[in-house]
C-alpha cells in the first residue's frame, strides 16, 4: 500500500470542519456546480463567457504587443512566467529576470563598454533586491497595460499599494541599510563576474551577470507568508501544509507570478473563474479581482484558500473519505472539478462522479486520478502537491 504523505493530523483537521484551463475550462467549471435553468440564466452565462473571451483576447494582445516592442532590442524577448519574473527598464535596454525556481537573479544590459555595463548592472541589482511589489508593478509597462484593461472591465482593485518586499527579506537577514546594499552589489557585480555576448544592435554588446540567491531561499520566502497562511488555514478549515504546497507548486513563492491563461500571484488565480468564484464567496459580490489585486499576497492567499475551501467543502462534499476528497480537491484546483469528474464518467458532473469515487479506497482514487485525469499537467500537479504537503508538514507542522 502506498505510504500516505497526507498525514493524520491534517486529515483530521479537514474532517472536522485552476487553474490550468482557459476558456473551455472556465465553461466546464460553470457546469460543475448546482444545476440552474431558464432563459435568463443561459443568456447571462453567454454574456459572461463573451466578456471572459474578450478579456483574454485583450490580455493576449497586450502581451503580444509588448513582446514585439522588447524584441526590437533583444534576440530573445523573455517574458514573465509562473516561476520567473522578468522586468525591463523604461528604455528596454536593461532587463532583470528573477528565477524563483532556479533561485537566481540574471541582469542583462546593452552597453558600449564593460565599464558602463558594470555601473548599470549594479544599479539594477540594487533596485531589484530592495524594491517592493508596488514599486515593481509601477515600473512594469506590461503590468500597467493590463491594469488599464482591468479598469475597463470594472475589476476589483487593491485598497492600498502593496509595500511587501519583493526580495529583500530573502537576500538580507534584516532590513538593509544603504551600506549593506552597496556591499552586496559590489561583491556580486564587477568586471570579473560580468560576461559579454553579441547583441542584435550594432555597436553594443549584451553584458550580463547571474547572482545566486542565498541558501534556503525557498524556505525563507515561505516564512514571509506564514502569518497569512496560518490565518487562512484556520479561517477556511484547511491544513496549513496544503496551502503552502499549492503556493510552492504554483509559483515557487513568486508574488509576481503570471501564466499565459492568465493567472496571477502566489496561488495562480484566474480572475474570471477561480478569482471571481472565491471573491464572490468571501465578499458576496460577483466581481473579478484585477491582476494588481492578485499580486497582493494577502489578497491572493485569502482568495486562493477560499477557493480550496469551495472545492473541498462544496464541490467535493459528497466524497466520504477525507483523504480521497483531498486528492480530488488538489486535482480540481489545477484542472477544475469538471475534469476530475471526467476522469470517472467522461462528463463534467462532479456530483454524479462521487458515487464511483466512494466505492474506492484513497489509494485507488489517487491511482485512478494519476491514470485518468484528462491532462498530463494535472497528473504531475497532484504528485507534486502531495509530496510537498509532506515537506511542509515536517517543516511547520499542521497549524
What label would you give each PLM region?
Residues 1-7:
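Bacterial N-terminal signal peptides that target proteins for export
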Residues 300-349:
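Catalytic and binding regions of secreted/periplasmic enzymes and modules that target cell-wall glycans
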Residues 230, 237-258, 269-270, 304-305, ...:
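Short, functionally critical alpha-helical segments immediately adjacent to catalytic or ligand/cofactor-binding
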Residues 8-15:
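Bacterial N-terminal signal peptides
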Residues 217-220, 291-301, 376-377:
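Active-site metal-coordination segments of metallo-dependent hydrolases
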Amino acid at each position: 500500500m502506498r505510504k500516505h504523505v497526507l498525514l493524520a493530523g491534517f486529515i483530521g483537521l479537514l474532517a472536522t470542519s485552476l487553474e490550468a484551463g482557459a476558456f473551455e475550462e472556465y465553461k466546464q467549471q460553470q457546469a460543475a456546480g448546482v444545476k440552474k435553468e431558464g432563459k435568463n440564466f443561459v443568456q447571462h452565462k453567454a454574456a459572461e463567457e463573451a466578456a471572459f473571451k474578450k478579456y483574454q483576447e485583450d490580455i493576449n494582445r497586450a502581451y503580444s504587443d509588448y513582446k514585439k516592442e522588447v524584441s526590437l532590442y533583444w534576440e530573445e524577448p523573455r517574458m514573465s512566467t509562473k516561476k520567473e519574473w522578468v522586468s525591463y527598464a523604461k528604455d528596454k535596454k536593461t532587463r532583470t529576470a528573477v528565477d524563483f525556481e532556479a533561485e537566481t537573479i540574471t541582469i542583462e544590459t546593452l552597453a558600449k563598454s564593460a565599464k558602463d555595463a558594470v555601473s548599470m548592472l549594479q544599479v539594477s541589482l540594487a533596485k531589484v533586491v530592495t524594491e517592493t511589489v508596488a514599486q515593481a508593478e509601477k515600473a512594469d509597462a506590461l503590468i500597467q497595460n493590463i491594469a488599464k484593461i482591468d479598469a475597463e472591465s470594472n475589476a476589483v482593485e487593491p485598497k492600498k499599494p502593496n509595500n511587501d518586499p519583493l526580495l529583500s527579506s530573502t537576500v538580507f537577514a534584516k532590513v538593509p541599510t544603504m551600506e549593506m546594499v552597496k556591499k552586496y552589489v559590489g561583491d556580486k557585480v564587477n568586471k570579473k563576474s560580468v560576461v559579454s555576448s553579441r547583441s542584435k544592435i550594432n555597436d553594443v554588446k549584451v553584458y550580463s551577470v547571474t547572482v545566486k540567491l542565498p541558501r534556503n531561499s525557498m524556505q525563507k520566502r515561505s516564512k514571509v507568508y506564514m502569518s497569512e497562511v496560518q490565518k487562512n488555514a484556520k479561517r477556511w478549515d484547511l491544513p496549513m501544509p496544503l496551502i503552502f504546497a499549492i503556493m510552492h507548486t504554483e509559483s515557487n513563492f513568486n508574488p509576481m507570478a503570471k501564466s499565459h491563461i492568465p493567472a496571477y500571484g502566489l496561488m495562480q488565480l484566474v480572475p474570471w473563474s477561480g478569482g471571481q468564484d472565491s471573491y464572490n464567496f468571501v465578499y458576496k459580490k460577483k466581481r473579478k479581482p484585477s491582476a494588481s489585486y492578485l499580486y497582493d499576497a494577502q489578497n491572493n492567499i485569502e482568495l486562493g484558500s477560499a477557493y480550496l475551501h469551495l472545492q473541498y467543502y462544496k464541490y467535493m462534499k459528497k466524497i466520504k473519505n477525507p483523504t480521497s476528497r483531498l486528492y480530488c480537491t488538489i486535482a480540481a484546483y489545477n484542472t477544475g472539478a469538471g475534469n476530475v469528474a471526467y476522469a470517472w464518467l467522461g462528463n463534467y458532473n462532479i456530483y454524479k462522479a462521487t458515487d464511483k469515487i466512494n466505492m474506492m479506497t484513497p489509494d485507488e482514487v489517487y491511482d485512478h486520478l494519476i491514470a485518468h485525469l484528462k491532462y498530463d499537467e494535472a497528473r504531475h500537479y497532484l504528485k507534486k502537491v502531495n509530496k510537498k504537503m509532506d515537506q511542509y508538514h515536517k517543516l511547520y507542522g499542521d497549524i
